[in-house]
Amino acid sequence: MQSRIDKLCEKMHDNEAVFISSYPNIFYYSGFTSEDAYLLISHSGKYIITDSRYTIQAREQAKGFEVIDIAKGFEKIFSRIDEKYIGFEESYMSVAENKRIRAKLKDGQDFVEMQNLINKPREIKDECEIKKIAEAEKIGDMAFEYILGRIKEGVTEREIAFDLEFFMKKQGATALSFDTISASGIRSAMPHGIATDKKIENGDFLTLDFGCVFEGYCSDMTRTVVVGKANDKQKEIYNTVLKAQTTAIDAIKAGMKCSEVDGVARKIITDAGYGENFGHSLGHSVGIEIHENPSFSPKNNAVVQNGNVITVEPGIYIDGFGGVRIEDLIVVQNGKAVNLTSSPKELIEI
């Protein structure tokens, strides 16, 4: 954790400190696993502010941080540091909380927005983070192999989702990355079709988008299968998405613009006549949170870097017919994409 703090402090001016209120950044910089805390990081000291329920836990997890009981020491916490500008995370703090924290500043100090500075180091995953994400993705791969044996005509979307989630937790997942997407038939045209009591029917597409959390880090993958035999149009759509996905993964190189990676997949889908049916970005970074930066989007000119962990998930969605999405999770290492997802991608007919 100290190396992460050192990198953060290198980006801060001598008269700047940061006050962190979001769980993802509290966990990233301290290792503390409760949401009931704040961090104050300056050039001269590190403080974790929490209540009496968590002070022992904070001492055990947040090594190198001075633990401050929120009931006793919070009122004068900013008097412990000399920095003038205290950075906060705009997206994670309500107006009311911001006002309450500002009232605790000492004379001459100012509360300023520094969310990008605080978040930026998380874009490049270290070896320990990559291992945890890879383990979470491995659990997802095992879950997909398991669920293939449970999918059949007459089973509901919700039953499939529940089975997936229960299996992942049995394998060591501590939570889900997000609500499992289980969408069949014409509902598969909804990119975020949350599971319902709809029964799976013969001839349906079934799209499953799921992930789990392992030691604080998320996984994410999507597979689309056909229940029964695929018709010609289903095969055409599926193979178009598969070509777009595999070609984009092969094209990823450190130094490329994220928009260029998106463009590789988008061109294939557009050339096949389905450009208007691919409405979302190609992918997003994954880490402590399921959606992080950078993303593979048409408008993102950020550069791909070694250590980025990003999804590649093109899709085609046709209202009234159904949809296909195929998603892998990749890490950029030695200048190219390394796939963390091992589940098969050829069209599966069940």
Regions found by a protein language model. Give the residues of each.
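Active-site neighborhoods and metal-handling regions in enzymes and metal-associated proteins
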Residues: 1-350
